[in-house]
Amino acid sequence: MRLNTLSPAEGAKHAPKRVGRGIGSGLGKTAGRGHKGQNSRSGGGVRRGFEGGQMPLYRRLPKFGFTSRKAMITAEVRLSELALVEGDVIDLNTLKAANVVGVQIEFAKVMLSGEIARPVTLRGLRVTKGARAAIEAAGGKIEE
């Protein structure tokens, strides 16, 4: 068996519709688009959210909220992700080096999700109560 002899099983693939190829094909002449109208034209159709000229839903509803600038530079880190980081001392730079958080991140908070078996020292990271208990139970410690 070689790569050039492989083929999908019989009946596993459907042939694509061939439209506009004569009356006998069942999809000739208008090619399944019907007669006239905007959708029969090439490039026809309306944009997403268009409701025929009626004020669309996304404009009928009021604007609300905002995007926190701090949320863009803050990351949540799971305990299971901490287990993947090499070394005993973990800080923001070691998380970035291990590709756990992106380079633009300035703050990280450790969440209780997954588990950690080895003792680690967290330096300069925020930690939830549950994650703190799990880290200390594994013999680790948290430095502010």
Swiss-Prot record:
Entry keywords, A to Z: Ribonucleoprotein, Ribosomal protein, RNA-binding, rRNA-binding
Single annotated GO MF: rRNA binding
Annotated region (Disordered), positions in chain: 1-53
GO CC annotation terms, alphabetical: cytosolic large ribosomal subunit
InterPro entries documented for this protein: Ribosomal_uL15, Ribosomal_uL15/eL18, Ribosomal_uL15/eL18_sf, Ribosomal_uL15_bac-type, Ribosomal_uL15_CS
Listed Gly residues bias regions: 21-31
Superkingdom: Bacteria
Biological process according to GO: translation
Function statement: Binds to the 23S rRNA.
Family statement: Belongs to the universal ribosomal protein uL15 family.
Known partners and oligomeric status: Part of the 50S ribosomal subunit.
Name of this protein: Large ribosomal subunit protein uL15
Origin species: Serratia proteamaculans (strain 568)
Lineage of producing organism: Bacteria, Pseudomonadati, Pseudomonadota, Gammaproteobacteria, Enterobacterales
Gene of this entry: rplO
